[in-house]
C-alpha cells in the first residue's frame, strides 16, 4: 500500500514536468494571472462613446447664386477624425478617452450645411409657387372681360363685297320657260329624279330599290349565270336578262323558264319591276321642278336688270 501511495504521489511531478519545461523556475504562470486581470463592469459603468453618427451626408441641393457652397472636409480633417476616434477597448482600461474636438466641429459643420441647404430649397419652392399664383391671379382678374363668359361665337359683319346680286349667267340659266306649263326647260330642271339610294356596309354595298328586287326575286343568280356563260365581252345581256331588244332573246327566256322551275321566286320579278316603274314615275312627278311636256314651245323670259343696292353704313 505504501508503495502505491509513493508511486501515486510521484506521478504529479512527472505530469507537471513537460508543462513547465519551457519556463524557468520562479516565473509566474500567465494563465494563473488571467482571472485576476479581467474585471466585470456593472451597468452604471457602461456608457455610450458618442450619441450621433459621424457619417452625415444629406441630399444634394443646388446652391443659390448669392450663397457660396460650404467647403468639404479635406484630407487633413479626415486624418484628424481618424485620430480622434477612441482606441480599441482593452480589458485593463474600462474607461475610454473622449473624442477629439476637431471631429465634433466637422460633424456640426456638415449638419449645418444640410439644414441650410434644405431651408434654401424650401424657400425657393415657396417663392416659385407664390409667383405662379400671383401671375395667374393677375391674368384672370385683369381687364373688364374677366367676369364675362363668351357662350356664342361672335359673328363678323357682312362686307359690301359679299352682298353682291346674282350674275347674268345665273339669271339666264332659268330664263327659258315652257309656253304651256310655264316651267323651266333647262337641262338641270328637266332631268328625271331617280329613287333615293345609299351605300351601306362601309360603302361596299349599294342599297337601292332595283337591288332589293334583284336579290329578293333571285334574279341575281340569273345575271351571274349569263355573265359566266357569255363569250362576248360587249354583251350586256347579264345586266338586263329580260330585255327583248338585245341578242339571244329566245335563248335567255328559255333559260329563265327552266330556272323558274327550281327558283319559283323568278315569277315575281316582272310584277315587282312594274311596281318599281310606277313608284319611279310618282317620285319624279313630285320632285322634278322642270317641264315634263313632250311637244311644247320655248319662251325666253327677260329678267329685268335691277341696279345694285348700296350697302354702306349710315353715318
Swiss-Prot record:
Region annotation (Required for interaction with CAV1) ranges: 118-315
Biased composition (Polar residues): 1-14
InterPro entries named among the record's database cross-references: Sprouty, Sprouty_domain
Any one Gene Ontology cellular component term annotated for this protein: actin cytoskeleton
GO molecular function: protein kinase binding; protein serine/threonine kinase activator activity; protein serine/threonine kinase inhibitor activity; ubiquitin-protein transferase inhibitor activity
Domain annotation SPR: ranges: 177-291
Region listing for Required for interaction with TESK1, in residue ranges: 178-315
Any one Gene Ontology BP term: positive regulation of cell migration
Xref: Pfam families: Sprouty
Keyword annotations of the record: Cell membrane, Cell projection, Cytoplasm, Cytoskeleton, Developmental protein, Membrane, Microtubule
PROSITE patterns the record matches: SPR
Site feature location: Cleavage: 144-145
Extent of Pro residues compositional bias: 88-100
Principal subcellular localization: cytoplasm
Description of post-translational modifications: Cleaved at Pro-144 by the prolyl endopeptidase FAP (seprase) activity (in vitro).
Membership in a protein family: Belongs to the sprouty family.
The protein's name in its UniProt record: Protein sprouty homolog 2
Organism (species): Bos taurus
Gene name, Swiss-Prot/TrEMBL: SPRY2
Amino acid at each position: 500500500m505504501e508503495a502505491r501511495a509513493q508511486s501515486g504521489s510521484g506521478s504529479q511531478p512527472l505530469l507537471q514536468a513537460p508543462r513547465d519545461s519551457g519556463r524557468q523556475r520562479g516565473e509566474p504562470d500567465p494563465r494563473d494571472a488571467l482571472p485576476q486581470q479581467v474585471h466585470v463592469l456593472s451597468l452604471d459603468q457602461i456608457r455610450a462613446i458618442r450619441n450621433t453618427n459621424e457619417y452625415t451626408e444629406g441630399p444634394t441641393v443646388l446652391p443659390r447664386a448669392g450663397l457660396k457652397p460650404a467647403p468639404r472636409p479635406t484630407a487633413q480633417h479626415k486624418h484628424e477624425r481618424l485620430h480622434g476616434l477612441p482606441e480599441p477597448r482593452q480589458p485593463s482600461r474600462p474607461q475610454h478617452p473622449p473624442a477629439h474636438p476637431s471631429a465634433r466641429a466637422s460633424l456640426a459643420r456638415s449638419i449645418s450645411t444640410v439644414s441650410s441647404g434644405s431651408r434654401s430649397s424650401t424657400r425657393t419652392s415657396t417663392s416659385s409657387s407664390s409667383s405662379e399664383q400671383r401671375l395667374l391671379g393677375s391674368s384672370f382678374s385683369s381687364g373688364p372681360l374677366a367676369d364675362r363668359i363668351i357662350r356664342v361665337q361672335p359673328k363678323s359683319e357682312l362686307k359690301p363685297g359679299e352682298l353682291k346680286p346674282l350674275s347674268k349667267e345665273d339669271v339666264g340659266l332659268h330664263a327659258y320657260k315652257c309656253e304651256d306649263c310655264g316651267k323651266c326647260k333647262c337641262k338641270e330642271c328637266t332631268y328625271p329624279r331617280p329613287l333615293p339610294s345609299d351605300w351601306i356596309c362601309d360603302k361596299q354595298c349599294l342599297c337601292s330599290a332595283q337591288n332589293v328586287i334583284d336579290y329578293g326575286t333571285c334574279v341575281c343568280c340569273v345575271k351571274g349565270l349569263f355573265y359566266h356563260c357569255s363569250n362576248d365581252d360587249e354583251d350586256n345581256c347579264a345586266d338586263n336578262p329580260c330585255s327583248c331588244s338585245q341578242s339571244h332573246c329566245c335563248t335567255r327566256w328559255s333559260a329563265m323558264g327552266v330556272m323558274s322551275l327550281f327558283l319559283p321566286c323568278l315569277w315575281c320579278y316582272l310584277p315587282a319591276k312594274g311596281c318599281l316603274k310606277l313608284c319611279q314615275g310618282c317620285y319624279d312627278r313630285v320632285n322634278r321642278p322642270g317641264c315634263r311636256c313632250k311637244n311644247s314651245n320655248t319662251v325666253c323670259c327677260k329678267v329685268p336688270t335691277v341696279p345694285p343696292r348700296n350697302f354702306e353704313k349710315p353715318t
